[in-house]
């Protein structure tokens, strides 16, 4: 769960167990396929997922045509396949799964600090405000898992998703 500021008011979060990086996904063969900066998307029609940072971050692109958000990532992917948008906002860590199912897509990622800023650190465990002991235990367990193990676990989860 993303540790957004509004969510922090209602629940407690562990330290992030996986960093969240946002990117844009486009169709191969379009003018955006070789984009290297957010500025390259000036005038592009970009789509996000309703009520998530996959939508809120679109306005960080100057001159963008911010399309009305859709309900889910599969809806976003369908719209990109249909060509009714130029790009969609995605979590970069999920890109391998999207590309496996959609070989005509291209992921555009950006150097650190030059891409979309979701406004939170990453994926965390969310707990009730009253669960302080459990929060401490969860953070202690997460601290025993090094980055290599976390990446392996994430990759295993991605590889076991239905395509």
Can you describe what each PLM-predicted range is?
Residues 8-12, 40, 60-61, 74-96, ...:
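Short helices/loops that flank or line small-molecule/ion binding pockets
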Residues 24, 41, 80-81, 138:
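Hydrophobic residues within well-ordered alpha-helices
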Residues 24, 46, 67, 107-108, ...:
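Generic preference for hydrophobic
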Residues 1-5, 28, 51-52, 72-73, ...:
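Beta->alpha turn/N-cap motifs
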